[in-house]
């Protein structure tokens, strides 16, 4: 089915005054969040439940009936821009964030507006665009982390603000040892620490992390961090990334875990990845610089892009971390740069590190661990391993024992790989996946019925070139990272069997890189959107495209499925992606089966 204009397919569209939906007063409490997998009609948290599997067991829409899938309603936000939200649904009400950090509550069966919170941005500039990846629901509140560095709790029935807290302000400990000039710089530039992820709620805590910490650039590798010199123009200092937990009732910070390890972020000066891939490092030079730059962890960057998964039995949350800062001048950050580019397990109640696995020590290429982590059980003979998997920008799916962090295996590569860990040169090298490739933030989906994981991939080659700049009379080398415009780029949707050491079961190629995420269902379907506006359903067993619909704008957000009454719905945001230059829009579309 292909329709160019959404106006032709709108069955219900409303900007009505607030009206309470049936059962809207039901509270999503701790027990419901713990048992979210059993609430098949709802989608209570990001990824649907704490395991982050992005799987719905609903099967009214299946391989036989999907050809009858049609739009049942369309809600247009009035705000165009990169639209990355994953809506939540509880008891017939949908909650969604939109670009610019407004939050809406909709009748999930009709798409009509129940209430809308209009966000007033406190900062005119941030280091990231207006996109937001979703809300969290619990204890009678809707929580949103914003692009102006705030965490907001709204009344779930009215959208009224309950509390509103700044989360991006540096602590006194972070500012310790800095000059007054640098303290002022960091404090006045907290707008460079927005938040994108949907918050995570458990017990009485709401957890969220900050982004853009790794955008800091080089300013002086020859002086200590206490230098009075502040980088000119846009040569921003990096800021120490973190994830933090807040009291759900007051917004008071309970603990904060930093993505850069204080005093020991140099690590072991690893010459290879953990799997043995050789890294281009001058260890003697790095060790020499490390003595001069021992406090560089204070501005070490490393963002947190996606909502952590949570294991209530182990009491651990799991998240991936971004690249260290400055990314373009590696000599300014000698050592492995712990815990950048890592999968990390954190005590959910104290914020203490349990284990970490650094995929790429001393990253030169922008290989953030940006995608969502997924929890699942991995058969091992007569036993079961509590496993965690995460797709990397390196192009592999990594599977670990989530209790110990031990790597069980990494999969077959789901995108092409070339010059993966090659050192940049004066002439320049072309590498892929590169900074834009592999698995970005887009959520993967895991089907617990067969153990297959479905990964949206990006093939977008990168050119890395050494450049030389003058700073304070010294010539400083830095890495210029560019899209390799002469190279073709595309996307891949890959099914990988986690029970067969990560073997690829099928793979399809798409015209454009895939950004947005996938949904697997009990109807043996996988749903995925594309930048060209197509929203499609595939047979989860063989990758055959069974259905598609042109949404009129890039579908670059993770879909969900839920049920209201006797009707199963598939819902997704269609608003495009400005970074990839996909067509913009402002719609959330709810699909269901037609009677014929």
Predicted region positions:
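Beta-propeller blade signature
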Residues: 154-159, 231-233, 239-252, 336-352, ...
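Beta-propeller fold recognition
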Residues: 29, 391, 395-438, 442, ...
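N-terminal cofactor/phosphate-binding cores enriched in small/glycine residues
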Residues: 52-171, 521
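Short coil/turn linkers that define WD40 beta-propeller blade boundaries
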Residues: 66-69, 111, 159, 251, ...
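Extracytoplasmic beta-rich repeat domains
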Residues: 75-86, 116-136, 164-198, 213-215, ...
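Blade/loop signatures of beta-propeller domains
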Residues: 23-71, 270, 274-283, 482-483, ...
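Bacterial N-terminal signal peptides
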Residues: 7-18
